[in-house]
Amino acid sequence: MAAITASMVAELRAKTDAPMMECKKALTEADGDMAKAEELLRVKLGNKASKAASRVTAEGVVASFVGGNAGALVELNCETDFVAKNDDFNAFAKQVAELVATKNPVDVAALSALPLDGKTVDEVRLALVGKIGENISIRRFVRFETANKLATYLHGSRIGVMVEYTGADEQVGKDVAMHVAAMKPVSLSADEVPADLIEKERRVAEQKAAESGKPAEIVAKMVDGSVQKFLKEVSLLNQPFVKNDKQTIEQMLKAANAAVQKFALFVVGEGIEKRQDDFAAEVAAQVAAAKQQ
């Protein structure tokens, strides 16, 4: 039996927002397997435990740039929300996004070596670290180059979207980008949803359906129905259009004689765990108290 530590409980709670003792029970049942414990909580607590995908756990900004036939999104991270609002920090993020679009670096290392203001990008970053007093890092970027149209949308500075599309109406591209920011699809179509996400959803659906006590053939239909519902919910073309939920995105595009080729979505801090030392101590104290009861 794996030892369940306070930090493990804290991590699972941060991912799921489930009660601490429920997290401890799930980890115990899963023998310390974090992914399995998260699935157990989803089965037990339903959608409350599905917050992991959208929970923001780090600070920073997303910056965008479109010029000519290329566009880019960049995520620049820092330690606090205060620095994320700093003018110099935001100006650097915009410069980096423009460099990605115009210079087409292959990765963050290549980007960091590009010239900027008489220095390299990394030298400018380090100078900014010294000036501001917080660690700053270029986490990721995406670049589109196309003969089609590009649209970007920034929700504040924490969510960024870029869409490649065709069609005469530029408002369509803007609307789709805004929709992606609001609804956060994981793929363009149901066929493109990653297999591991589908399998994870199927396992959860199977466990929920099995608890219904219904015949096997009914359980199988329940599972298939749950998976199909999931695929529609997370694929862009099948989602109800956020500005008119009587239409799906696919129907809206068809009516506008437009099409979307691909999109990119960045959410600041997605998947990054923020240090929560005080919270871990609180968890440890409550777990210890529970053991004495």
Curated annotation (Swiss-Prot):
- GO MF terms held by the record: translation elongation factor activity
- Where would you say this protein principally sits, based on its record? cytoplasm
Keyword field = Cytoplasm, Elongation factor, Protein biosynthesis
- Pfam families given for it? EF_TS
The answer on whether this UniProt entry bears the keyword Ribonucleoprotein reads no
Identify the InterPro entries for this entry.
EF-Ts_dimer_sf, Transl_elong_EFTs/EF1B, Transl_elong_EFTs/EF1B_dimer, Transl_elong_Ts_CS, UBA-like_sf
Domain of life, per the record?
Answer: Bacteria
Q: Which GO terms describe its cellular component?
A: cytoplasm
Compartments it resides in? Cytoplasm
Which segments carry the region annotation Involved in Mg(2+) ion dislocation from EF-Tu? Answer: 80-83
What HAMAP family would the database entry show? Answer: EF_Ts
Q: What is the purpose of this protein?
A: Associates with the EF-Tu.GDP complex and induces the exchange of GDP to GTP. It remains bound to the aminoacyl-tRNA.EF-Tu.GTP complex up to the GTP hydrolysis stage on the ribosome.
Family per similarity comment: Belongs to the EF-Ts family.
Record protein name field: Elongation factor Ts
- Gene name as annotated: tsf
